[in-house]
Amino acid sequence: MSVVVYAPASIGNVSVGFDVLGAAVSPIDGSLLGDRVLVESGSDAFTLATSGRFVDKLPENPQDNIVYDCWKVFARELETKNVTLKPIHMVLEKNMPIGSGLGSSACSIVAALDALNQFHDKPLTEMELLALMGEMEGQISGGIHYDNVAPCYLGGLQLMVEELGIISQEVPCFDEWYWVMAYPGIKVSTAEAREILPSQYRRQDVIAHGRNLAGFIHACYSKQPELAAKMIKDVVAEPYRERLLPNFAQARAYAASAGALTTGISGSGPTLFSICKDKDIAERVSRWLQDNYVQNDEGFVHVCRLDKQGSQVTGSKL
């Protein structure tokens, strides 16, 4: 028996919701922007192989790979439920650049834990699995947060609530929006991008942040796309992080002039996203970003839509 799970890229924060909003995205051309994990029966308790475009960025020792840690916490949870852990062989197909702001670690974590759960006939509930995903994400970034793993796993636009046993709930968004994702090919460490933020904020910034986030959520529920786009402003992180992103200011200015609704930093960067209301504008912005924002052969630009499905079983073979 074997199972393969694909986990899509995600936009942490979506500018307006620092650590509490996240959106899953997939390219409109059908290409896979995310990681895949295979779980199959093995002869040992655990073995791991790696492949994919960004495999050379992974640690050589399998026990230093986050997938190994996912297996360990999954085994811990099965023990509490008196469920037998099967001997397995796992393969991580690493298609996502590390330190990209596209939820790369979340892709590996979600694909690994979802595949492990599927392989063992789903002994863990959705929320139990999501809690483990947040725990693993915290191990990498230094603090538990769900704004990448929740959309990556559940799909769509997710709001982190973390009350009444509910970690995250989906917020209705706009199917007509195109999300242009541009990764320049350089790395920004999440931990470094967090250290650059101030320890305290001015009262007017706190008020602006609350107004923007509340206004955005209201506009999503009341189906006002223009208002929603206007509310996507970041007063918490972007003013401090944009200096880590070469040409970000120019890219944002061009996208606005080309008709994009808004442009922001995806997660902690260096990937940016531009939301466009029609395909022609999205493709125009995409071409400019490919020529002016991408810095090397590892960079790329994709025109995407919201991925409503999140992680999914794609078969039994990579």
Curated annotation (Swiss-Prot):
Q: What is this protein called?
A: Homoserine kinase
**Localization per record:** Cytoplasm
According to its UniProt record, which reaction does this protein catalyse? L-homoserine + ATP = O-phospho-L-homoserine + ADP + H(+)
Give one Pfam hit by family name.
GHMP_kinases_C
* Principal subcellular localization: cytoplasm
Pathway info: Amino-acid biosynthesis; L-threonine biosynthesis; L-threonine from L-aspartate: step 4/5
Q: Which GO terms describe its molecular function?
A: ATP binding; homoserine kinase activity
GO CC annotations on file = cytoplasm
Q: What is its EC number?
A: 2.7.1.39
Locate the residues binding ATP. Answer: 97-107
Q: Which organism is it from?
A: Aliivibrio salmonicida (strain LFI1238) (Vibrio salmonicida (strain LFI1238))
Source taxonomy lineage? Answer: Bacteria, Pseudomonadati, Pseudomonadota, Gammaproteobacteria, Vibrionales
User: Which SUPFAM superfamilies does the UniProt entry name for this protein?
Assistant: GHMP Kinase, C-terminal domain (SSF55060), Ribosomal protein S5 domain 2-like (SSF54211)
